[in-house]
Amino acid sequence: MIRVEALELGYGERLVLKGLNFQVERGEFVGILGPNGSGKSTLIHALSGLLAPRSGKIIIRDEHLGSLSSRLRAQMLGVVPQTSDVRFPFPCLEIVLMGRYPHRKRLGSLTDEDLLWALRSMRRTTTEHLQERPVTEVSGGERQRVVIARALAQDPQILLLDEATSSLDVRKKLEIFEILRFLNATKGLTVLCAMHDLNLAALYCGRLMFIKDGGIVQDGPTEEVFTPAILGQVYETPMEVIRHPGHQRPYAVMLPLKEGEIEGDAPEVARA
């Protein structure tokens, strides 16, 4: 469904990612992990068409991403950014209905089916009570859930998320990922999400891609790559991986840094 070949990405004179080669099949749930500044968001921007590659190819369903019309691209790809800068006081329902525009007939108006899609998506993201509220007057977490509802109403084949739940509380974060898991399992929705939460990624993603130093350093099934050695290599932090007693998925436990491992002028701290 997605094929990336010899991809190089950057901004101005700065090269961020180089030599990327990977494929994502329909129905995969992929977590993109790595330290701050490693290029996770850059990759999501490129896959969504917001950032043109310096070189290489991004193929979506046998079509070059750059050759797709904005309408066709929006029918295939849904994108949820880390934050949404919505400056106009549109009602939240209207924001969600914007996700239906790629499916409208040319010069056609919104249909009852479009409204049903929007209301269903708001119900799934527990934002139905915000229908008439101006999006500029809801909290940041509520606004982000409205934006996620818009992406679900879009009914894409591929959903790209860039730290999309980082502003949500624990309960809402889990609710969103349960929705994604349900759509992934029942409708074959392909999900790629850039994340910082290691254990959330291990819980929901079937495949993990670790990015560091301008490239992909590890890529594979979660059960194979979520290991102390790989996590330590990527994050330069000592960790243990255990089986969570509740869900039996791998679970990372961070260990304290030893003396001499802290960068900068860290104060001396007496350890208990």
Regions found by a protein language model. Give the residues of each.
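Catalytic Walker B motif of ABC-type/P-loop ATPase nucleotide-binding domains
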Residues: 159-163
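The feature captures the beta-strand-to-loop junction immediately N-terminal to the Walker
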Residues: 33-35
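Conserved ABC transporter NBD signature motif
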Residues: 56-64, 73
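Conserved ABC ATPase signature
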Residues: 109, 134-138, 142
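Conserved catalytic motifs of ABC-family nucleotide-binding domains
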Residues: 155
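Helix-to-loop junction immediately C-terminal to a conserved catalytic motif
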Residues: 48
